[in-house]
Amino acid sequence: MIATAPDERINRVSRTPSSLARERMLSRRGEPLFLADWMRVLMIHFEVDASELQRVVPYQLDLHDERAFVSLVAFTMENMHPRLGGKLGAWLFNPIATHDFLNVRTYVRHNGEPGIHFLAEWLSSWLAVQLGPRTFGLPYRHGRICYQHDLEQGCLVGRVEDVKRGNHLKYRAEAVLGAPFAPCERGSLDEWLMERYTAFNAVGHTRRFFRVWHPPWPQCAAQVKLEDLSLLQDNWDCFKEARLVGANFSPGLHDVWMGRPHCA
């Protein structure tokens, strides 16, 4: 599925989070900055204690029915390149164009705009880890990551190890073979968790945000077995009493729009 711009018919249908995100993205000149493919995406959702979580988040939490959530997003980013620059730009970005991610994100609202805040992001690319904090204010960490997200073979397995500390995340997941991939039901908790398009982050006293855009996630429900949570429990107290509430798998999206960093 290609994240190409929808035509004018989008103005004649109900306003989805995706359509609103596209409007916000294009309200700034020069956007988007990058394009990339976000592939074989597994999102695992936890409910956590809101007051415990708020202590480590520099933005106001966005709650759903007074409940706070943290999600893990395990995926492979492929073919990241500047929107402009053609083959030369793609060649220059080749060393960091493709790598695995584990995002640990929570849900915030800033100046009336819903978004996410990354508690941490583990990347398999050492070079990308050096660049992210300097440019986007992102909390990158280096990880040894092994994903086998092959739904057709019934295999959704992941292992992430922090290179410095050695703690792990290990999981196995299942989804119904042949289940249709479709956007989340409008107004559902799944939509609230998955359809987020602005990232608010901070380094020291400097707050930044950037926006992304893509069509609504094509997804299906997944069932997850967590085998090792030390990567999370050793870093955040709120995970010691966290409750697994669900998971979603998506085959991914091509040509996701990724915006520039801005002051929040």
Placement of each model-derived feature along the sequence:
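Hydrophobic, proline/glycine-rich low-complexity stretches
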Residues: I2-G85, W213, W217-A264
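Structured, non-membrane catalytic/scaffold regions adjacent to prosthetic-group chemistry
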Residues: M25-L26, P32-D150
